[in-house]
From Swiss-Prot:
Subcellular location per the Swiss-Prot or TrEMBL entry: Plastid, Chloroplast thylakoid membrane
Annotated transmembrane regions: 70-90
Record topological domains on the Lumenal side: 68-69
Any single Gene Ontology cellular-component annotation: chloroplast thylakoid membrane
Family: Belongs to the TatB family.
Polar residues composition bias: residue spans: 135-152, 187-204
Disruption phenotype: Seedling lethality. Non-photosynthetic mutants possess near normal pigment levels but lack one or more elements of the electron transport activity in chloroplasts. Defects in protein targeting across chloroplast thylakoid membrane.
Membrane in keyword set: yes
Protein name from the UniProt record: Sec-independent protein translocase protein TATB, chloroplastic
Principal localisation: plastid
Stretches of the chain forming a coiled coil according to its record: none
Transit peptide residues according to the UniProt entry: 1-67
Length: 243
């Protein structure tokens, strides 16, 4: 800047240092006394607190409101688009544009339906394939579990170890032993009777021995009869020769 221009400009106003300090330094916060919880002051504080809570609740409600939208376009955006369309096309142009849009949508309705049907069929086929894969995996997984649960075959050469007796089997064995001992104590003649029954069938055989035909049996008297009657023997021989 030229010196003439500096001379023409007005001089800045004089500001004292105290005013500058006041402007720079923030005001000191004084400690306010605690409110008295008596009388009207309590009511005023209560109303203030309630109003603050209501304001906070209204803010949160406003934030949580979900705005409906069509193809990602909300209500205010649609209004703005409508106003711009009115300014650009005018009322008559908007009516014609709406008619053309309706005609195009009606013309594309069958194609849209076909696309929807194709998408549904594709989805159903995908679900079926996924379900078939899941079923096959489950069926393949079951035999593995069965094979894991199967026990190894026992070797024929190895003798099986006797299974430990259970408490019920031990009780049965003890009861049987007690019953047998009691029967033997009360009936001591049972072994003698059993021995007699075993010896009984052997005695008839000794009685039937002479009748079966031995050296000293009934064959001896037959021989005596044949020796005592030689005439009868001759007659029988003659009769056989005549025949």
């Amino acid at each position: 800047m030229t010196p003439t221009a500096n001379l023409l400009l007005p001089a800045p106003p004089f500001v004292p240092i105290s005013d500058v300090r006041r402007l720079q330094l923030p005001p000191r916060v004084r400690h306010q006394p605690r409110p008295c919880w008596k009388g009207v002051e309590w009511g005023s504080i209560q109303t203030r607190m309630v109003s603050s809570f209501v304001a906070v609740g209204s803010r949160t409600r406003r934030r949580n409101v979900i705005c409906a939208s069509l193809f990602g376009v909300g209500a205010p955006e649609a209004l703005v688009i409508g106003v711009v369309a009115l300014l650009v096309f005018g009322p008559k142009g908007l009516a014609e544009v709406a008619r053309n849009l309706g005609k195009t949508l009606r013309a594309f309705q069958p194609t849209i339906r076909e696309l929807q049907d194709v998408s549904r069929e594709f989805r159903s086929t995908l679900e079926r394939e996924i379900g078939i894969d899941e079923v096959s995996q489950s069926t393949n997984y079951r035999p593995t579990t069965m094979n894991n649960n199967q026990q190894p075959a026992a070797d024929p050469n190895v003798k099986p170890e006797p299974a430990p007796y259970t408490s019920e089997e031990l009780m049965k064995v003890t009861e049987e032993q007690i019953a047998a001992s009691a029967a033997a104590a009360w009936n001591p003649q049972q072994p003698a009777t059993s021995q007699q029954q075993e010896e009984a069938p052997t005695t008839p055989r000794s009685e039937d021995a002479p009748t079966s035909g031995g050296s000293d049996g009934p064959a001896a008297p037959a021989r005596a009869v044949s020796d005592s009657d030689p005439n009868q023997v001759n007659k029988s021989q003659k009769a056989e020769g005549e025949r």
